[in-house]
């Protein structure tokens, strides 16, 4: 038989064992202030977390043009791991796919800034009165074209399909060098503006003056030929009149001689 002393120790140990067993069976207590970290990111989806505390629930939102795939969920919840006592979000199952109802919408076209390039080109003389691109220093977002003697405006490329656009540019003028400015916007009409040097303009004026003088000389020569030709038919008529006037005078003189002879 056990001694009374051993029995006393056994009775005192029972409450301790019961307390240890109760602590093992009870769940771990959550530490105050425990929060979840930021949730993981999902492709084509966004989330705005309002509360990071345990047991809070949040939802993902698919971006514009996408929608939630069937069988997936946008809901996540902040829970705590009982083994490690660490809070975390539940694994999201959301998948965002492109919305087929928006497939027929075309994307917004991007705006392309026109580019202005300049390259030298040898001037070509012409008999026509040329046109010029009037230069404006420090001018932006405007394009002005004026007609002036000594310059020329010629189209360089055909109009491409689409709308025409005009870009802002600054034009400069060199007195002795012909410059060609080409406007090249994406889907627009491009113009080549050629400036002729003063030497070429002077040659053009000389050629025009020479042509005018030649035409005037031809007109004068034609008038003289017509005048000479018109004067030629009048001479036979005058000879015939003079002959007719001399014949009666001869007849009268002969008749007088006959009368004198008869007497």
Swiss-Prot record:
Q: Where in the cell is it found?
A: Membrane; Nucleus membrane; Cell surface
The residues that cross the membrane are: 206-226
Major localization class: membrane
Which residues does the UniProt record annotate as the domain Sushi? 34-98
- Disulphide bonds annotated for this chain are 36-78, 62-96
Source domain of life is Eukaryota
Q: Which residues lie on this side of the membrane: Cytoplasmic?
A: 227-263
Q: How does it assemble?
A: The interleukin-15 receptor IL15R is a heterotrimer of IL15RA, IL2RB and IL2RG. IL15RA also self-associates. Interacts with SYK.
Name the chain's protein. Answer: Interleukin-15 receptor subunit alpha
Species whose genome carries this gene: Mus musculus (Mouse)
Q: Which gene encodes it?
A: Il15ra
């Amino acid at each position: 038989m056990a001694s009374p002393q051993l029995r006393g120790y056994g009775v005192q140990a029972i409450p301790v064992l019961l307390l240890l067993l109760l602590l093992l069976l009870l769940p771990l207590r959550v530490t105050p202030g425990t929060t979840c970290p930021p949730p993981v990111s999902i492709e084509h989806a966004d989330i705005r977390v309002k509360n990071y505390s345990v047991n809070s629930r949040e939802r993902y939102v698919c971006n514009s043009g996408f929608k939630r795939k069937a069988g997936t969920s946008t809901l996540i919840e902040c829970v705590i791991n009982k083994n490690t006592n660490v809070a975390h979000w539940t694994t999201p199952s959301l998948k965002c796919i492109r919305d087929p109802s928006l497939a027929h919408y075309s994307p917004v076209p991007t705006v392309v800034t026109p580019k202005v390039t300049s390259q030298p080109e040898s001037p070509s003389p012409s008999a026509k009165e040329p046109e010029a691109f009037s230069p404006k220093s420090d001018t932006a977002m405007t394009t002005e074209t004026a007609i002036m003697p000594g310059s020329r405006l010629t189209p360089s490329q055909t109009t491409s399909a689409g709308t025409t656009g005009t870009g802002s540019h600054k034009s400069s003028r060199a007195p002795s060098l012909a410059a060609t400015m080409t406007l090249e916007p994406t889907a627009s009409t491009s113009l080549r503006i050629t400036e002729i040097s003063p030497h070429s303009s002077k040659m053009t004026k000389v050629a025009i003056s020479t042509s005018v003088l030649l035409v005037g000389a031809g007109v004068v020569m034609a008038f003289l030929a017509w005048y000479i030709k018109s004067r030629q038919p009048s001479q036979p008529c005058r000879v015939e009149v003079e002959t007719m006037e001399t014949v009666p005078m001869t007849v009268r003189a002969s008749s007088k001689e006959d009368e004198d002879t008869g007497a």
